[in-house]
Amino acid sequence: MAKKVVTDLDLKDKKVLVRVDFNVPMKDGKITNDNRIVAALPTIEYILEQNGKAILFSHLGKVKTEEDKEGKSLRPVAVRLSELLGKEVKFVPTTRGPELEKAIDELKDGEVLLFENTRFEDIDGKKESKNDPELGKYWASLGDVFVNDAFGTAHRAHASNVGIASNLESAAGFLMEKEIKFIGGVVDNPARPLVAILGGAKVSDKIGVIENLLTKADKVLVGGGMTFTFMAAQGQEIGKSLLEADKVELAKGLLEKAGDKLVLPVDAVVSKEFSNDAPFHTVSADSIPADEMGLDIGQATIDLFTKELQGAKTVVWNGPMGVFELSNFAKGTIGVCEAIANLTDATTIIGGGDSAAAAMDLGFADKFTHISTGGGASLEYLEGKELPGVASISDK
């Protein structure tokens, strides 16, 4: 990777600005999953070991009005981070001004400060999300060097990543470095055979990824709601299954281009209702009843996909195989997750989002080589797009 990493910087006595991804799920003011905070620890701890002063900031949710601020403060994150680090994390409840500047000036080597949600700046003209140059310059003025460890927002050009990096020497944190290595590796130089498994509801969300991976992968296995648009493109009856009618022609084109590289399900678990209480059964993919909808892949498809995965050296998975949140239609996702987890000599990567949640829920997280922390960023990377948050980091 030709970008500077945090280990390339001299951090002793330095004020180190760190863009982390602390966009954690919250309920009633409490953090329900702290994975993203845990993922940032190696970078923060390294800065402290090097006697730097860690000045952390992140967004949390979307903030458009004063009312939106309710429940979007990073204060609970500071408390949790303090517990994880085993040391005080000074929280500053503002994003600019004398209080923040004074707190940073008083910071000693090896100390940590977290300031308020960067998107509080969006209330007045979307300064953070639109990468307001003055805001980027101001935040850059608060530190000596900048470390970007927020891969989750790398596909966005915001003041808190690109804006600061255009004004200050910058480097990738350890998490960002890992994401670039694994997700970038799939696109740029994978060990072969490379098998991609793509799920999720909509073809429209994954068109770019499918198109790019058809040029890179040896096989692309497709599951989830988007399979029915491909089936319709082949002239199959799909009953009441999810269909993006305006994408059928596009799906047809992808099928023609892909040949036998694209593998579709051979059966489906169907039901008359989108409900866990309704009766369900498995049918062949080409005989879905007119009054039923496909909500998961069946056992024959799980077996087929498991077979296609054998011998793979690199596997990337993004998106569930069915309606994972309803237990009757989660078996396909579980089956695929198990099949990937059982591969012994492959680099296995989950591209964030629902698939990452599925692997963690099932207790398989440690069986994968890498689970990405950025859903949208991973997808854009897999599409072959340049990510502004990565591109703006200083070159070595």
UniProtKB/Swiss-Prot annotation:
<dbReference type="GO" id="GO:0004618">
    <property type="term" value="F:phosphoglycerate kinase activity"/>
</dbReference>
<feature type="binding site">
    <location>
        <position position="206"/>
    </location>
    <ligand>
        <name>ATP</name>
    </ligand>
</feature>
<dbReference type="InterPro" id="IPR001576">
    <property type="entry name" value="Phosphoglycerate_kinase"/>
</dbReference>
<feature type="binding site">
    <location>
        <position position="294"/>
    </location>
    <ligand>
        <name>ATP</name>
    </ligand>
</feature>
<comment type="similarity">
    <text>Belongs to the phosphoglycerate kinase family.</text>
</comment>
<dbReference type="GO" id="GO:0043531">
    <property type="term" value="F:ADP binding"/>
</dbReference>
<feature type="binding site">
    <location>
        <begin position="21"/>
        <end position="23"/>
    </location>
    <ligand>
        <name>substrate</name>
    </ligand>
</feature>
<dbReference type="GO" id="GO:0005829">
    <property type="term" value="C:cytosol"/>
</dbReference>
<feature type="binding site">
    <location>
        <position position="119"/>
    </location>
    <ligand>
        <name>substrate</name>
    </ligand>
</feature>
<keyword id="KW-0324">Glycolysis</keyword>
<comment type="pathway">
    <text>Carbohydrate degradation; glycolysis; pyruvate from D-glyceraldehyde 3-phosphate: step 2/5.</text>
</comment>
<dbReference type="GO" id="GO:0005524">
    <property type="term" value="F:ATP binding"/>
</dbReference>
<keyword id="KW-0547">Nucleotide-binding</keyword>
<keyword id="KW-0418">Kinase</keyword>
<comment type="subunit">
    <text>Monomer.</text>
</comment>
<dbReference type="InterPro" id="IPR036043">
    <property type="entry name" value="Phosphoglycerate_kinase_sf"/>
</dbReference>
<dbReference type="InterPro" id="IPR015911">
    <property type="entry name" value="Phosphoglycerate_kinase_CS"/>
</dbReference>
<dbReference type="InterPro" id="IPR015824">
    <property type="entry name" value="Phosphoglycerate_kinase_N"/>
</dbReference>
<feature type="binding site">
    <location>
        <begin position="59"/>
        <end position="62"/>
    </location>
    <ligand>
        <name>substrate</name>
    </ligand>
</feature>
<dbReference type="Pfam" id="PF00162">
    <property type="entry name" value="PGK"/>
</dbReference>
<dbReference type="GO" id="GO:0006096">
    <property type="term" value="P:glycolytic process"/>
</dbReference>
<feature type="binding site">
    <location>
        <position position="325"/>
    </location>
    <ligand>
        <name>ATP</name>
    </ligand>
</feature>
<keyword id="KW-0067">ATP-binding</keyword>
<protein>
    <recommendedName>
        <fullName>Phosphoglycerate kinase</fullName>
        <ecNumber>2.7.2.3</ecNumber>
    </recommendedName>
</protein>
<dbReference type="GO" id="GO:0006094">
    <property type="term" value="P:gluconeogenesis"/>
</dbReference>
<keyword id="KW-0963">Cytoplasm</keyword>
<feature type="binding site">
    <location>
        <begin position="352"/>
        <end position="355"/>
    </location>
    <ligand>
        <name>ATP</name>
    </ligand>
</feature>
<feature type="binding site">
    <location>
        <position position="36"/>
    </location>
    <ligand>
        <name>substrate</name>
    </ligand>
</feature>
<feature type="binding site">
    <location>
        <position position="156"/>
    </location>
    <ligand>
        <name>substrate</name>
    </ligand>
</feature>
<keyword id="KW-0808">Transferase</keyword>
